Amino acid sequence: MAVGVSPGELRELTDEELAERLRESKEELFNLRFQMATGQLNNNRRLRTVRQEIARIYTVLRERELGLATGPDGKES
């Protein structure tokens, strides 16, 4: 997964793609936290970037839910 995904890139994805991206990010965050607890994590910054990515995905989904933004095909999803 790319580091530092922009909100613009996320807005181009469909709801299904966002849900898949969210699942992958949550799984990665779980693994990073496990590595941190066992002392195997070298890059602590990655925890923050993954959490920010999850927040961005939730924000895009919420914008669509409230009708503040549309899906990538121009229709409301």
Curated annotation (Swiss-Prot):
Pfam families referenced in this protein's UniProt entry, alphabetically: Ribosomal_L29
GO biological process, one term: translation
Alphabetized GO MF terms: structural constituent of ribosome
Signal sequence annotation: none
Keywords associated with the record: Ribonucleoprotein, Ribosomal protein
PROSITE patterns named among the record's database cross-references: RIBOSOMAL_L29
GO CC aspect terms: cytosolic large ribosomal subunit
Family the UniProt entry places it in: Belongs to the universal ribosomal protein uL29 family.
HAMAP family linked to this entry: Ribosomal_uL29
Alphabetized NCBIfam families for the sequence: L29
Protein name: Large ribosomal subunit protein uL29
Annotated source species: Mycobacterium tuberculosis (strain ATCC 25177 / H37Ra)
